[in-house]
């Protein structure tokens, strides 16, 4: 079993309801939510604000926690040094957030192309977790717990959620 990696991400919206997505310059070049790993002794909300500010330049208000999303395969062996391998076991805290202000407060880190997308016109090249988390956030869900399909008991759907919808 691999060590669990704790991460954060946020479905960041602007006043018109568009969603901020980041397209990494390497890898499969899919769009994802802004976010990153927690630092030692850092709370998930503090990490989310820090990562979003560093990656996008925007200051945000965290509205609430959409849910926890588990990625990867904890049973997968670690990759050999210098080689790609299975995604490590990652637990992502996904928040719902709003931008503060009319423009970024700082400079975005390199390596990420940022763009705003209307919720009804999201790009096709989204990571599966991003697609699911955005749908959950825009539907007003909170307290969602999601795992990849290969971690679920037989007969349980991968798209099923535990949680509530905000009034």
Go through the PLM ranges and name each one.
Residues 1-19, 37:
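Conserved N-terminal beta-strand and adjoining loop/helix that marks the start
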Residues 4, 29, 89-91:
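Residue-level preference for beta-strand/loop junctions
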Residues 32-35:
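A short gly/proline-enriched turn/hairpin at secondary-structure junctions
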Residues 38-61, 71-135, 163-167:
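Unchanged
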Residues 63-67:
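Conserved S-adenosyl-L-methionine
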Residues 135-167:
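Charged phosphate-binding loop/patch that engages nucleotide di/tri-phosphates or the phosphate backbone
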């Amino acid at each position: 079993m691999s060590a669990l990696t704790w991460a954060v991400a946020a479905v960041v919206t602007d006043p018109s309801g568009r969603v901020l997505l980041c397209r990494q310059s390497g890898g499969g070049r899919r769009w994802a939510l802004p976010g990153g790993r927690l630092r030692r002794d850092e709370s998930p909300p503090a990490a989310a604000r820090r990562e979003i500010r560093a990656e996008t330049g925007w200051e945000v208000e965290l509205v609430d926690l959409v849910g926890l999303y588990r990625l990867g395969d904890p049973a997968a062996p670690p990759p050999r040094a210098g080689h790609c391998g299975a995604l490590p076991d990652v637990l992502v805290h996904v928040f719902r957030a709003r931008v503060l202000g009319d423009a970024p407060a700082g400079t975005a880190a390199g390596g990420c192309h940022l763009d705003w997308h209307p919720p009804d016109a999201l790009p096709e090249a989204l990571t599966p977790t991003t697609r699911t988390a955005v749908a959950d956030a825009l539907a007003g869900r909170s307290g969602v717990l999601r795992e990849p399909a290969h971690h679920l008991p037989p007969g349980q759907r991968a798209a099923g959620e535990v949680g509530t919808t905000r009034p």
